[in-house]
Swiss-Prot record:
Gene3D superfamilies: Aldolase class I. It comes from Pelodictyon phaeoclathratiforme (strain DSM 5477 / BU-1). Keywords: Amino-acid biosynthesis, Aromatic amino acid biosynthesis, Isomerase, Tryptophan biosynthesis. InterPro entries: Aldolase_TIM, PRAI_dom, RibuloseP-bd_barrel, TrpF_fam. Pathway: Amino-acid biosynthesis; L-tryptophan biosynthesis; L-tryptophan from chorismate: step 3/5. This is N-(5'-phosphoribosyl)anthranilate isomerase.
Amino acid sequence: MTKIKICGITRLSDALESCRAGADALGFNFSSLSPRAITPERAKEIIEKLPPFVASTGIFVDQSPEEINAICRFCKLQIAQLHSEQYSPEDARAITEAKVIKVFRPEENFAVEEVFAFAEKSGINAFLFDAYRPDMAGGTGETIRASLATRIFNALGDSCYPILAGGLNESNIGEAIRSLQPYGVDTASGVECEPGIKDPVKIKAFIQAVRKTVF
């Protein structure tokens, strides 16, 4: 069954609505440049009220491994998502307070060998692929070109746990899952009425669309 992460959570009501609808994980963005930015203090308040079996994920863009470990420990995050090209395999190995997901934002000439090399050097086995945009790390509402995504996911096969992100919504998620068969999918803008404010109807529709898709 395809795993689902609802990202860019800023309000408790949105977090609980996502959980009730069947989300497997929630994402909290700690980048001050994001329109969905949240403080560790506020994230901790929300995470403490989550039901069991929902993984809390921190999105990090410019923090050091030491800062990431401290935030993960403080908030009791289960996953640290490294959403920047600046993070090296050594950085990933230095994060010990949570499981790590490394993000790639591939352009057309992306070499899949980069993923294999990062996995070998870091020891991590989960990678998220998001649409590339130079001025924004995630939550752009833009999708990865279908041919590029297909090339990447086909090459990866069962070597890791690939997660698809980038402009996913109720309308396009079914075809994306059937085509790529990702381990998980991640959406932020696809279930919002404005950045950081989720729409309960869109959340339910997105999760239902994922659950009814088989491959």
